[in-house]
Swiss-Prot record:
EC supergroup of this enzyme: transferase
One cellular component (GO) term of this entry: cytoplasm
Species for this entry: Methylococcus capsulatus (strain ATCC 33009 / NCIMB 11132 / Bath)
Sample GO molecular function, one term: metal ion binding
Originating gene: ndk
InterPro entries assigned to the protein according to its UniProt record, in alphabetical order: NDK-like_dom (IPR034907), NDK-like_dom_sf (IPR036850), Nucleoside_diP_kinase (IPR001564), Nucleoside_diP_kinase_AS (IPR023005)
Protein name: Nucleoside diphosphate kinase
Length: 143
């Protein structure tokens, strides 16, 4: 199995609910290590750039407005099959379809305010990590 890194964002709705620690605990219990983290208030430009792949989609403006509505926690997770493991922890995009016990089932209220973002593959993970973190901000967890 490959050790991977993936980007995770705890979105404004979950930050406002004060569940950052509960979500971090789930990452760690699943064997994922946090190798970088920061809280940020995204600018409109940052959110538009990050979600540029969705620019032509009808939900783009609402997504950007939501992502700048409050602070977010941005972290890089590392571990065996980190991308798939994080996506499993998150649950389906729509919390109504998310399996019980997943982050979205427990903390999200709608498909729009769905608590977390996670990279969907190795290439996007690398791009998304580089969007928010310089390489010297990533701290290998060797102990």
């Amino acid at each position: 199995m490959a050790v991977e890194r993936t980007l995770s964002i705890i979105k404004p709705d979950a930050v406002a609910k004060n569940v950052i620690g509960e979500i971090y605990s789930r990452f760690e219990k699943a064997g994922l290590r946090i190798v970088a983290a920061k809280m940020a208030q995204l600018s409109r430009e940052q959110a538009e750039g990050f979600y540029a792949v969705h620019r032509e989609r009808p939900f783009f403006n609402d997504l950007v407005s939501f992502m700048i509505s409050g602070p977010v926690m941005i972290q890089v997770l590392e571990g065996e099959n980190a991308i798939a493991k994080n996506r499993e922890l998150m649950g389906a995009t729509n919390p109504r379809d998310a399996a019980p016990g997943t982050i979205r089932a427990d903390f999200a209220v709608s498909i729009d305010e769905n608590a977390v973002h996670g990279s969907d593959g190795p290439e996007t993970a690398a791009q998304e990590i580089a969007y928010f973190f310089e390489s010297d901000e990533l701290c290998p967890r060797t102990r």
